[in-house]
Design a protein with these regions (language model features):
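Structural signature of nuclease core domains in nucleic-acid processing machines
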Residues: 1-292
Length: 292
């Protein structure tokens, strides 16, 4: 009803195509709102802020400041779609970052290791490093990508008439109480992994990280941002795109190819990351034990 009133007042165009697009938008909005309602009803995490600014200004969370070797600095700025908070009975505070995406999204730690898809993790660590604001002392619970407008799938008519199944991706703190706080009934609908025989799926272990692993990710990203900042100040901006794999060449959708004149296949970098990024290095004894 609200959408119809708004459209009538501000969008007077009345064509068959417009009517179809409007009906599709209403259906999508209704489905998403119902999903968010159901998720909030069972979750211990609740929105603490939406469109939360990181950087400077009123109501903003201070962005992390990175100090370079020559005395210059780099400051993180941005906007968090949604920051959720959970406070335990003992006073322990947890914070998670939620990002709404369209289409598909998969968080790949190998890509994070190389400097891709770092945004939400950098935002999370800025919140947990907040020394005097609303998130002071909060523990990192993770980052979630909510596919708010899933890419269309080929399916039969009966399945197409069912409710949209929203998918989550991301990285969550590897503690059972955090899982329960996000997905009380262990349905797998509200976590980036499912359950198998009553336990988190072993095949989706890369969607979970204990505090030690999160700390390693944080330190690695600190080094990456510092390195990037130094290179920018030094004028090192060669057109050498990082191609993460087949179909992942960033030049395909870049609007500035006519400026850098990059030629596909020339001067491109490939992913160079450990097989298990951010995991502790195995000792010789551990390697021998696995081989035995």
């Amino acid at each position: 009803l609200l959408v119809d009133e708004y459209a009538k007042r501000y969008l007077p165009e009345d064509t068959a195509r417009f009517a179809y697009l409007l009906s599709r938008l209403k259906k999508s909005m209704t489905s998403l709102l119902c999903y968010l309602r159901d998720e909030q009803k069972q979750s211990c995490f609740h929105p603490a802020a939406c469109e939360l600014r990181i950087g400077s200004g009123e109501d903003a969370v201070p962005g992390q400041v990175y100090h370079l070797s020559d005395g210059r600095t780099v400051q993180l700025v941005g906007t968090v779609d949604r920051a959720d908070e959970w406070v335990e009975e003992n006073g322990t505070r947890w914070v998670r970052v939620v990002d709404y995406k369209t289409g598909t999204k998969k968080l790949n730690l190998k890509e994070v290791y190389c400097g891709l898809d770092c945004q939400m993790l950098l935002y999370l660590f800025s919140l947990t490093r907040d020394k005097s604001g609303r998130f002071t002392g909060a523990e990192p619970a993770g980052v979630l990508y909510l596919l708010a407008d899933p890419a269309p799938k080929t399916t039969n008519r009966q399945q197409a008439q069912q409710d949209v199944q929203y998918e989550l991706d991301g990285l969550v703190r590897d503690e059972q109480k955090v899982f329960d706080a996000m997905d009380a009934d262990e349905t797998g609908r509200y976590l980036p992994f499912g359950y198998r025989n009553g336990v988190p799926s072993p095949s989706q272990k890369d969607k979970r990280a204990d505090i030690a692993k999160l700390n390693r990710i944080q330190l690695h990203l600190d080094d990456l941002v510092t390195q990037m900042g130094q290179q920018l100040y030094d004028g090192q901006i060669a057109a050498e795109p990082l191609v993460a794999g087949a179909g992942k060449n960033p030049c395909v959708w870049c609007d500035y190819g006519f400026i850098c004149c990059h030629e596909t296949g020339i001067g491109e970098r490939a992913l160079e990351a450990p097989a298990k990024p951010f995991e502790p290095e195995e000792t010789e004894n551990e390697k021998e034990g696995e081989q035995a």
